[in-house]
Amino acid sequence: DFMRWEIQALRDGGTAKPVTTNFMYDYQGLDYSKFADDLDVISWDNYPTWHKEAEIETAWDCGLQHDQMRSYKGQPFLLMESSPSATNWQPVSKLRKPGMLKLASLQAVAHGSDSVLYFQIRQSRGASEKFHGAVIDHYGGEDSRVFQEVCDLGRTLKQLKEAAGSNTPKQAAILCDTESRWAM
């Protein structure tokens, strides 16, 4: 209900702009399928733990999460948050290996994302998020590997711009029932 009240306040204020909210990776506290009708577009925060032993399982799980986000409205979604390098809250905050930024980002696009957005653009100067990755790190130069990889990804996405808004026909389905999961 809270989200609906926020949307109504925006609509009452005269805006017709699309509304969304950040869904989180495999979060079980809410049934996201019940939010979809009230949102104009689905968006989510993707922070997988890459570079661990079961890396292929991480890739599968990310693909499943992307597909689930697309399924809520049957249309492209937005990758609202991702880290171009490390995260500050995982047990071990590993810097992504060279090329992983592009691989993970293009995986999202291949599964129906119309965006690759980052938290954060400039690395925070204080609190715990000063350790969270960013496009522009504390050094601030354009010659860092992460900055250069983001630029390279931007060039690649520009070449793929015709894919934006496209929707692949579904050929299979996996039923996910949050309320049944809660009951278990």
Question: What feature does the model see in each segment?
Answer:
Residues D1:
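Active-site-proximal, well-structured secondary-structure segments within enzyme catalytic domains
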Residues T21-N22:
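Short His-Asn-centered micro-motif
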Residues L30-D31:
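Short, glycine/polar-rich helix-capping loops at beta-to-alpha or helix-loop-helix junctions
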